[in-house]
UniProtKB/Swiss-Prot annotation:
It comes from the Viruses. The keyword Ribonucleoprotein does not apply. GO terms for molecular function: structural constituent of virion. Belongs to the pneumovirinae M protein family. This is Matrix protein. The gene is M. Keywords: Host cell membrane, Host cytoplasm, Host membrane, Host nucleus, Host-virus interaction, Membrane, Phosphoprotein, Viral matrix protein, Virion. Plays a crucial role in virus assembly into filaments and budding. Early in infection, localizes in the nucleus where it inhibits host cell transcription through direct binding to host chromatin. Later in infection, traffics to the cytoplasm through the action of host CRM1 to associate with inclusion bodies, the site of viral transcription and replication. During virus assembly and budding, acts as a bridge between the nucleocapsid and the lipid bilayer. Also plays a role in the inhibition of host interferon-beta response in a RACK1-dependent manner. InterPro entries: Matrix_Pneumo_C, MATRX_N_pneumovirus, Pneu_matrix_N. A motif (Nuclear export signal) lies at residues 194-206. Pfam families: Matrix_Pneumo_C, Matrix_Pneumo_N. The keyword Heme does not apply.
Length: 256
């Protein structure tokens, strides 16, 4: 089994982002990616990852108003994992590598192939795209980040476009907007990291909360969902060999 600890915060209390790669234990096993709802922990990361690697995982494919989903049950005999959610539902479209192999409404045990733990800042120092969007009044434009990664083994590049936030812009300001936005994001983007969670996340440490980063606390972490980019690679391979190399920005008028 592979285990991986990614420390993006060194404080005594942190937010634990846990993701598993598992394989069903049946005659036609499906490969699954499972992420646990984030939780707060003060346990040393090296100890927590050992406990996380020794749990039992059961999954069942179900249908929900949000589409195909996986109900996950994690069983552990360790009291040290009391803070970790043990029953939760995740999106099957992100989780499943080969959905045709997963039976419907059948509870199936899984073998853990890899486990990743990322230590983020405490909950009050984390911000998501949804948090920012809710605070935008009368938005007119979207800020899109084009995140570039390089596989240092193959030298191949991957560009992942991701929505950051909506903003309200007057027409007379459009000519200078892109330069301003790039300047505001420049320092933060140099601190960007990718982590395995619900596929992949981009974690940006915010050094300045002016302009596009308004409403974010300085030195907090801004979390951006990049999607299901771990389907064909292991947790360890991506986090070790995918390096963030650059980010460009596009300012797009909102579509009706």
């Amino acid at each position: 089994m592979e285990t991986y600890v990614n420390k993006l915060h060194e404080g005594s209390t942190y937010t634990a982002a846990v993701q598993y790669n598992v394989l069903e234990k049946d005659d036609d096993p499906a490969s699954l990616t499972i992420w646990v709802p984030m939780f707060q922990s003060s346990m040393p990361a090296d100890l927590l990852i050992k406990e996380l690697a020794n749990v039992n995982i059961l999954v069942k494919q179900i249908s929900t108003p949000k589409g195909p989903s996986l109900r996950v049950m994690i069983n552990s005999r360790s009291a040290l994992l009391a803070q970790m959610p043990s029953k939760f539902t995740i999106c099957a479209n992100v989780s499943l590598d080969e959905r045709s192999k997963l039976a419907y409404d059948v509870t199936t045990p899984c073998e853990i192939k890899a486990c990743s733990l990322t230590c983020l800042k405490s909950k009050n120092m984390l911000t998501t795209v949804k948090d920012l969007t809710m605070k935008t009044l009368n938005p007119t434009h979207d800020i899109i980040a084009l995140c570039e990664f390089e596989n240092i083994v193959t030298s191949k590049k991957v560009i992942i476009p991701t929505y950051l936030r909506s903003i309200s812009v007057r027409n007379k300001d459009l000519n200078t907007l892109e330069n301003i936005t790039t300047t505001e994001f420049k320092n933060a983007i140099t601190n960007a990291k990718i982590i395995p969670y619900s596929g992949l996340l981009l974690v940006i440490t915010v050094t300045d909360n002016k302009g596009a980063f308004k409403y974010i606390k300085p030195q907090s972490q801004f979390i951006v969902d990049l999607g299901a980019y771990l389907e064909k690679e292991s947790i360890y391979y991506v986090t070790t060999n995918w390096k963030h190399t650059a980010t460009r920005f596009a300012i797009k008028p909102m579509e009706d």
